[in-house]
Amino acid sequence: MPKEKNHLNLVVIGHVDSGKSTSTGHLIYKCGGIDKRTIEKFEKEAAEMGKGSFKYAWVLDKLKAERERGITIDIALWNFETAKSVFTIIDAPGHRDFIKNMITGTSQADAAILIIASGQGEFEAGISKEGQTREHALLAFTMGVKQMIVAVNKMDDKSVNWDQGRFIEIKKELSDYLKKIWLQPRQDPFIPISGWHGDNMLEKSPNMPWFTGSTLIDALDALDQPKRPKDKPLRLPLQDVYKIGGIGTVPVGRVETGLLKPGMVLTFAPMNITTECKSVEMHHESLTEAEPGDNVGFTVKNLSVKDLRRGYVASDSKNDPAKDTTNFLAQVIVLNHPGQIQKGYAPVLDCHTAHIACKFDEIESKVDRRSGKVLEEEPKFIKSGEAALVRMVPQKPMCVEAFNQYPPLGRFAVRDMKQTVAVGVIKEVVKKEQKGMVTKAAQKKK
C-alpha cells in the first residue's frame, strides 16, 4: 500500500433501501481492489443462482460474507483509489441495530457519503421523524465526520425519471436539516446519481445534462486529507482481539492519536494491563510505526486473548497512559427521548469502541446548545431538544478522555429503546489510579 497518496477512511451511510450496497459495490468494482478473477467467480455464481442481473450489490454481499467468516479477508477488497487518494470503506449498514456499529464505525471515518433514495415516498420515509436519514446525518456529525458528500440516488426511478425539480426539492429539504445540525454553513456537495446504471458516479450523466456539478469520484478526490494528531500520546481503541495460531494474541484497532511502534511497552485501560508490543501489521505488511488513521493488527507478549477485549484502549505506558474512569462531566444533547431524563438514568453509552452503561449521576445545569450559556442550575429533568451538563458514572470499568485532548475518545452516543436518544461531548474526566498486571516482557523493558 503506497503511503504517498492521501489515505481516507470513508463511511457510507443511508436509509436501509437507499441503494447503499449497489453504489458502494459500483465504486469498489470500478476503481477498487477486486481482481478480475474474483469478479468472474462472483459473476458465475450470480448467474448460477439466477441473480444474472448481477449488479454491484452482489459484490458487496459476497465480500461481507467472506469478511464475516474470518479475519483473513484481504482488506484491500474494501479499498478503491482515485487520482489523489486511497479510500478504505468502513461498512455502516442502514438497519436500526446497525446504528451501534455506525457509532463505533464513524468515529473512525474521515468522510461520509450520505446516500439518499430520491423515489417518491422513499426520500420522505428516510427524512421523517422515524426514518434513519436524520439519525445517520446526526450521528456522523456527533462522531466527528468533518466532510460529507450527499449522493441523491435512484434518479433513474420511474417516479423521478431524472427530474431536476425532484433533485432541487430534496437538496433544499436536506440542506435545511443539515444546517440545523452542523450549526454553521457548509458546502457539502449534492450529486444526483444512479448507483445501478452508474450515472454521475465516474462519468457525467447524459441523462442529467442540467447538472453541472462534479461526479461522485471527483467529489471524493476533492476531499481534504484530515490532519492526523501524530504528536499526541498514543490512543488505540480495540475493535477486536484474535488468537492466531503460531502468532499469538492479536488486538486489532485504529490508531486514533500518537504512534504505535514495535518494542513499545503498552498499557491497556481500563484494566491497567501492561505488556510489550512485538510487531505491527497493516494490510499484511509489517510496519515500523503506525500513525493516526491506520487500521492495524499488533502482537503482544504474555497475554491471552481473554485478557483483552473490544473497548479497551492501548496507550504508551511511558507517555500519559490511558486509565480507568471514576466519573466524567459531559455536555449532553437529548435528541429523541419520549419522556424526561432524570438523575439515576443509566442507559448504554457507545464511546469509541466501548459499549457500557453509565449513570446520569447529577444533572448540573441546563445549557443553550449553541452558546453553552447556563439556562438553569440543577434542573430536575431534561427532555428532547435540550442540552445539559451531566456528571456521569460508568457502571463498569471504562476508558474515556476529554474531547479537547483526545477527540475520538471524548464523544459518545446514548442508546436506549433501540435508538440514539442523546449524544454528548466529554468536558473533563476524573481518572482512577489502580494497580494492574505487568507482564514479564514489560518488566524486562523497565
From Swiss-Prot:
Alphabetical keyword list: Cytoplasm, Elongation factor, GTP-binding, Nucleotide-binding, Protein biosynthesis
A molecular function GO annotation: GTPase activity
Domain tr-type G: 5-230
Residues that coordinate or bind GTP: 14-21, 91-95, 153-156
Region of interest called G2, as start-end residue ranges on this chain: 70-74
Region (G3): 91-94
Family membership: Belongs to the TRAFAC class translation factor GTPase superfamily. Classic translation factor GTPase family. EF-Tu/EF-1A subfamily.
Protein's name in the database: Elongation factor 1-alpha
Organism per entry: Stylonychia lemnae (Ciliate)
Taxonomic path: Eukaryota, Sar, Alveolata, Ciliophora, Intramacronucleata
